Amino acid sequence: MNINEIKRKIIPILLKHGVKRASIFGSYARNEQKETSDIDILVEFGEGKSLLDLVRLKYELEEVLGKEVDVLTYNSIHPLLKDRILNEAVDVL
């Protein structure tokens, strides 16, 4: 599965869950993914979303993609990793 296939599959789910902004980072963004690679996604929700909403989003993304998905919010990126992650991120929304 390439990054364009991932985008096509996840955009409707992201919109359904109230995501305002999203990017893919990590091995898929660098085109270095392996069969065992997870998919790393950054999201920014609209107002009023909780940790439970993040868990629901992660679960639905994993169901559709058939792979493990790590979902982070832009605000939760560790400061020491932030520049590297944002530089390699590929925008989805």
Swiss-Prot record:
Enzyme class of the recorded protein, top EC level = transferase
What Gene Ontology molecular function terms does this protein carry?
ATP binding; metal ion binding; nucleotidyltransferase activity
Q: Does the keyword Nucleotide-binding apply?
A: yes
Write the Enzyme Commission number(s) for this entry: 2.7.7.108
Q: How the cofactor binds, per note?
A: Binds 2 Mg(2+) ions.
Listed binding positions for Mg(2+) 2 are D38, D40
Cofactor(s) the record lists: Mg(2+)
List the ranges annotated as motif GSX(10)DXD motif. 26-40
For this UniProt record, the keywords arranged alphabetically read as follows: ATP-binding, Magnesium, Metal-binding, Nucleotide-binding, Nucleotidyltransferase, Toxin-antitoxin system, Transferase
Q: Describe its partners and assembly state.
A: Probably forms a complex with cognate toxin MJ0434.
Record PANTHER family: PROTEIN ADENYLYLTRANSFERASE MJ0435-RELATED, SSL8005 PROTEIN
Say which family it is in. Belongs to the MntA antitoxin family.
Query: So what does this one do?
Result: Probable antitoxin component of a putative type VII toxin-antitoxin (TA) system. Neutralizes cognate toxic MJ0434 by di-AMPylation.
- Protein name per UniProt: Putative protein adenylyltransferase MJ0435
**Species this chain originates from:** Methanocaldococcus jannaschii (strain ATCC 43067 / DSM 2661 / JAL-1 / JCM 10045 / NBRC 100440)
